[in-house]
C-alpha cells in the first residue's frame, strides 16, 4: 500500500517538475516542437496578433491565443476551439483511440467565403517585449494540455470511450475493442432483427448511466486535471452545450434511474462494468442486487466478457464473489458482488463505483449499508431499478422526485400532465409527448396492456409503466379547491371604491430570505386588510437580492416600504394603523435591522408628505426564551400548521379576496400577481409523516418556491388573532 502511494506521489512530483521546466523553456523550444508536431493541433506555435483590450478583460483560448474574455462565454467558439485540440488525438494516438473519439460531424465551421476573406487580413503584431506576457500565458496553458494528454489517466479515459464506441459500433455483438480487426465470437442472443443495420444505438438512460460513470471516474483518477477533462468528454459524448452546472450534476456522488421492465438495465451494466474493469487501473467496483440469484448471472457474464475480450490470463475469480483484472504493469482492478441479504460483503470496502440493481426491492438494512458510502468522496452510488409503484415499500426511490439536487431519473412514456388521461383510456400506453420515444425491442400497445390487466388489475400502470398510486402511502392531494381558486382569480373587489366600509388597519408580514439564488427562496411580503369576516389582499412582493452585501436588510426594508407607499397612494383616506411582523427565524439581528429600516423609510415618506400616511406604524414584538427584552421580530414555531389550517379553511370558504388594485413592484409586468400567487398555492401539499401522523404543509415542489404564499398565510393568521396590548408596539423615535 505504501509503495503504491509513494509511486503515485513520485509521478505527481515528476509531472510538476516537467511543467515547471516547460514553462521556463518558453516559446523557443515550443516553437521547435511545433515545427515537428505534424497535425497535432496542441503543438501549434504562438500566433502573435495584437488586441485592443485591457489585460483584465483578456483570456487565453487554448490553441488560439489571447482574446477578449467575451469569447470564453461564446459556447460555439469555445467548444470549436477545444474540439480541434482533442480531435488531433485521433491523428496523434494510434490504435485504440484512432478515429473513435470525435463523433461524426461536419468539419466546416466557417463559411468558405468568410475563410477566404480572413486570409487577406493582416494582423497587427506586438513587439517582442509586448508579446512576452501573451506568449508565456499561451504556452503555460498549452503545457497544461500537454500534461493532461500525456498522463496515463487521460489515456485510460480515452481508451474507455474508444472501446465503448467500438462496442456500440457492432451492436454489442463484437469485441474488436483495440481496433486490430480481430473479433472474438460471442454467445448467441435472441434479439430484434437489425435489418442490415450495423451500428448499434443506446437508449437515453443508458447513455446517461455511461456518462455518470465516465465523468465521475475521470474526475477521480485525473486529480489536478479533472477540471480540464470536461471539454474532452463534451466532445466524445457530443454535448457541446453542456453547462458547468450540468457537468457538476454528472459528477455528484449518487444518482437514481427508474426504468420500466425489460428495457435493458442489467444487460447494459454488464459491458459497462467489464470495460471499466479492463481499462481503469486500480478501480474498485461494487455490485449488489436484491437477491443472490440476481448477482450470479451478472457475475458469470462479466467474467465471460473479460475472458472473451482479453483472454484468461488477466482475469481472476475469487470464491465466486469478486473478479480482478490484472494489467501489464502489475496494477489490478476489482469488482465485488453481494446481495442485499448479505451486505457484509461490501462493508469495509473502498469502492469507486457502487451499482445497486433493482434497488427498490433491496432490504432496508441493506439500504443503510449502501448509504454509508456517501461519506466516501471518491465513491459514486448508481441506483438502478424498475419503476414499481404497487407498494410503498418497493417504491421508496420514487420519493426523490422533485428533489432540488435532481437525483432521480425516471424513464416514462406518460408525462405528469397526461397521466390521468392515460389511466382513463384503457388502450393507451403512452401520451402524445413520448409516444415516439418507445424502443423497438419492447411491445407496448393496447393489447399488451389489456392482457396485463386481465392477470392483475392496475398491473400495467404499477409494474410496467410506474406512476400509479402507491398503496399504503400518503399521496399529496391539492388542498385548495378548484372553485375557490377560480373565485379568487376572477372576483376582485375594489378596495379604493369601497375603502369607507373596510377596516382601517393593515397587516404586513415579511418573510426575509438572504440568498441570491433565484431558484431557491426569496423574500415574501404580504399586505392584507379586513372587511367584516373576509380578508382582502392589498399588496404582495417576491423579492430577490442581487448580491449578498451589508445593505441586504436595507434593500428588503425598502421593498416593503415601497409596497406600502403605493397602497397609501391609491387610497385617499389614511389608514389608522399598519401592523408589521418581520419573521426572525433565519436571523434575529437581520429581522431587527429590517424593522428599523422600514420605520426609517416610512418616516422619510411621512416627511415628504406626498401620500396619506397612517396614524401609527406598529411592529410585532417577541420576547426570546431566556430574555426579558422584547424585540421587533416574529418567531414562527408551532403556529405554522395552525396558520395553514386557518388559511385553507378561509380560502376554500371564499373568505380570502384579492383587491382589484393589488400592488406588486417585484412581480413582472406581464404576469398577474394573483396568477403568480396561485401558482405557488397549487404546489401546496399536506404530508403526513411518522407513526404519530405529524402533519406538515409544504409548497416547495418541482423547484418552486412558496415565499409569497407563506407571507400571505401568516398575515391572515396574525390579523385573525385577538387584539392584545403588547403584541404590536411602535419603535423608538429615530
Curated annotation (Swiss-Prot):
- The annotated active site, in chain numbering, is 358 (for atpase activity), 511 (for nuclease activity), 583 (for nuclease activity), 707 (for nuclease activity)
Q: Which GO terms describe its biological process?
A: chromosome organization
The record, for Gene3D superfamilies, names:
3.30.420.320, P-loop containing nucleotide triphosphate hydrolases
GO CC terms on record?
host cell nucleus
Indicate which residues form the motif Walker A motif: 259-266
Ranges annotated as spanning the membrane:
none
Motif Nuclear localization signal extends across 184-190
InterPro entries, from UniProt?
A: DNA_pack_C, DNA_pack_C_sf, DNA_pack_N, HSV_TRM3, P-loop_NTPase
Its keywords, alphabetically, are: DNA-binding, Host nucleus, Hydrolase, Viral genome packaging, Viral release from host cell
- Quote one Gene Ontology molecular function term: hydrolase activity
Q: Where is this motif: Walker B motif?
A: 353-358
Q: What EC number(s) is this enzyme filed under?
A: 3.1.-.-
List locations, semicolon-separated: Host nucleus
What does the record note on quaternary structure?
A: Interacts with the terminase subunits TRM1 and TRM2. Interacts with portal protein.
HAMAP family, per database record:
HSV_TRM3 (MF_04013)
Q: What does this protein do?
A: Component of the molecular motor that translocates viral genomic DNA in empty capsid during DNA packaging. Forms a tripartite terminase complex together with TRM1 and TRM2 in the host cytoplasm. Once the complex reaches the host nucleus, it interacts with the capsid portal vertex. This portal forms a ring in which genomic DNA is translocated into the capsid. TRM3 carries an RNase H-like nuclease activity that plays an important role for the cleavage of concatemeric viral DNA into unit length genomes.
Family, according to the entry, reads as follows: Belongs to the herpesviridae TRM3 protein family.
Q: What is this protein called?
A: Tripartite terminase subunit 3
Starting at the broadest rank, the lineage of the source organism is: Viruses, Duplodnaviria, Heunggongvirae, Peploviricota, Herviviricetes
Amino acid at each position: 500500500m505504501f509503495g503504491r502511494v509513494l509511486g503515485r506521489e513520485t509521478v505527481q512530483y515528476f509531472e510538476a517538475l516537467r511543467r515547471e521546466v516547460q514553462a521556463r523553456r518558453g516559446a523557443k523550444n515550443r516553437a521547435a516542437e511545433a515545427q515537428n508536431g505534424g497535425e497535432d493541433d496542441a503543438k501549434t506555435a504562438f500566433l502573435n496578433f495584437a488586441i485592443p483590450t485591457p489585460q483584465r478583460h483578456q483570456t487565453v483560448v487554448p490553441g488560439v491565443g489571447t482574446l477578449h474574455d467575451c469569447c470564453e462565454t461564446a459556447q460555439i467558439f469555445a467548444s470549436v476551439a477545444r474540439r480541434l485540440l482533442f480531435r488531433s488525438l485521433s491523428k496523434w494516438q494510434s490504435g485504440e483511440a484512432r478515429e473513435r473519439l470525435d463523433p461524426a460531424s461536419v468539419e466546416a465551421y466557417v463559411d468558405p467565403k468568410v475563410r477566404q476573406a480572413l486570409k487577406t487580413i493582416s494582423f497587427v503584431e506586438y513587439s517582442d517585449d509586448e508579446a512576452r506576457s501573451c506568449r508565456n500565458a499561451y504556452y503555460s496553458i498549452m503545457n497544461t494540455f500537454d500534461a493532461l494528454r500525456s498522463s496515463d489517466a487521460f489515456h485510460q479515459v480515452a481508451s474507455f470511450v474508444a472501446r465503448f464506441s467500438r462496442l456500440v459500433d457492432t451492436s454489442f455483438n463484437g469485441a474488436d475493442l483495440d481496433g486490430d480487426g480481430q473479433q472474438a465470437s460471442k454467445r448467441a442472443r435472441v434479439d430484434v432483427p437489425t435489418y442490415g443495420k450495423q451500428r448499434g444505438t443506446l437508449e437515453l438512460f443508458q447513455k446517461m448511466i455511461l456518462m455518470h460513470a465516465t465523468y465521475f471516474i475521470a474526475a477521480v483518477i485525473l486529480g489536478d486535471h479533472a477540471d480540464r477533462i470536461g471539454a474532452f468528454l463534451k466532445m466524445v459524448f457530443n454535448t457541446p452545450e453542456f453547462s458547468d452546472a450540468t457537468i457538476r450534476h454528472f459528477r455528484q456522488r449518487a444518482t437514481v434511474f427508474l426504468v420500466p421492465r425489460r428495457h435493458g438495465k442489467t444487460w447494459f451494466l454488464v459491458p459497462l462494468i467489464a470495460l471499466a474493469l479492463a481499462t481503469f487501473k486500480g478501480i474498485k467496483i461494487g455490485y449488489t442486487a436484491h437477491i443472490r440469484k440476481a448477482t450470479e448471472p451478472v457475475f458469470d457474464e462479466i467474467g465471460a466478457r473479460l475472458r472473451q475480450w482479453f483472454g484468461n490470463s488477466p482475469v481472476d475469480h475469487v470464491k465466486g464473489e469478486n473478479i480482478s483484472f490484472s494489467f501489464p504493469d502489475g496494477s489490478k482492478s476489482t469488482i465485488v458482488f453481494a446481495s442485499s441479504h448479505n451486505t457484509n460483503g461490501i462493508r469495509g470496502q473502498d469502492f469507486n463505483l457502487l451499482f445497486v440493481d433493482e434497488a427498490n426491492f433491496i432490504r432496508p438494512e441493506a439500504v443503510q449499508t449502501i448509504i454509508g458510502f456517501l461519506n466516501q468522496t471518491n465513491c459514486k452510488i448508481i441506483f438502478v431499478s424498475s419503476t414499481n409503484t404497487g407498494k410503498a415499500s418497493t417504491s421508496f426511490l420514487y420519493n426523490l422526485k422533485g428533489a432540488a439536487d435532481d437525483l432521480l431519473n425516471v424513464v416514462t412514456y406518460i408525462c405528469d400532465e397526461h397521466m390521468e388521461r392515460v389511466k382513463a383510456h384503457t388502450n393507451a400506453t403512452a401520451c402524445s409527448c413520448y409516444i415516439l420515444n418507445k424502443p423497438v425491442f419492447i411491445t407496448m400497445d393496447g393489447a399488451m396492456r389489456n392482457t396485463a390487466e386481465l392477470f392483475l388489475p392496475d398491473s400495467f400502470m404499477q409494474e410496467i409503466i410506474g406512476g400509479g398510486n402507491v398503496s399504503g402511502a400518503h399521496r399529496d392531494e391539492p388542498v385548495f379547491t378548484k372553485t375557490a381558486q377560480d373565485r379568487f382569480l376572477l372576483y376582485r373587489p375594489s378596495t379604493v371604491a369601497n375603502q369607507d366600509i373596510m377596516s382601517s388597519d393593515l397587516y404586513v408580514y415579511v418573510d426575509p430570505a438572504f440568498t441570491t439564488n433565484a431558484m431557491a427562496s426569496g423574500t415574501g411580503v404580504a399586505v392584507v386588510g379586513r372587511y367584516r369576516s373576509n380578508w382582502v389582499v392589498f399588496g404582495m412582493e417576491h423579492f430577490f437580492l442581487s448580491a449578498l452585501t451589508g445593505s441586504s436588510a436595507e434593500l428588503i426594508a425598502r421593498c416593503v416600504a415601497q409596497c406600502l407607499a403605493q397602497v397609501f397612494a391609491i387610497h385617499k383616506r389614511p389608514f389608522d394603523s399598519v401592523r408589521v411582523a418581520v419573521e426572525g427565524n433565519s436571523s434575529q439581528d437581520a429581522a431587527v435591522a429590517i424593522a428599523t429600516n422600514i420605520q426609517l423609510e416610512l418616516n422619510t415618506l411621512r416627511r415628504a408628505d406626498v401620500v396619506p400616511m397612517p396614524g401609527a406604524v406598529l411592529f410585532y414584538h417577541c420576547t426570546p426564551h431566556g430574555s426579558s427584552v422584547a424585540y421587533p421580530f416574529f418567531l414562527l414555531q408551532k403556529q405554522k400548521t395552525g396558520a395553514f389550517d386557518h388559511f385553507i379553511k378561509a380560502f376554500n370558504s371564499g373568505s380570502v379576496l384579492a383587491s382589484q388594485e393589488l400592488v406588486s413592484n417585484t412581480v413582472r409586468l406581464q404576469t398577474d400577481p394573483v396568477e403568480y400567487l396561485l401558482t405557488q398555492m397549487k404546489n401546496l401539499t399536506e404530508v403526513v409523516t411518522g407513526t404519530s401522523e405529524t402533519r406538515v404543509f409544504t409548497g416547495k415542489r418541482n423547484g418552486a418556491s412558496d415565499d409569497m404564499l407563506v407571507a400571505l398565510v401568516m398575515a391572515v393568521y396574525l390579523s385573525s388573532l385577538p387584539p392584545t396590548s403588547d403584541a404590536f408596539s411602535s419603535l423608538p423615535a429615530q
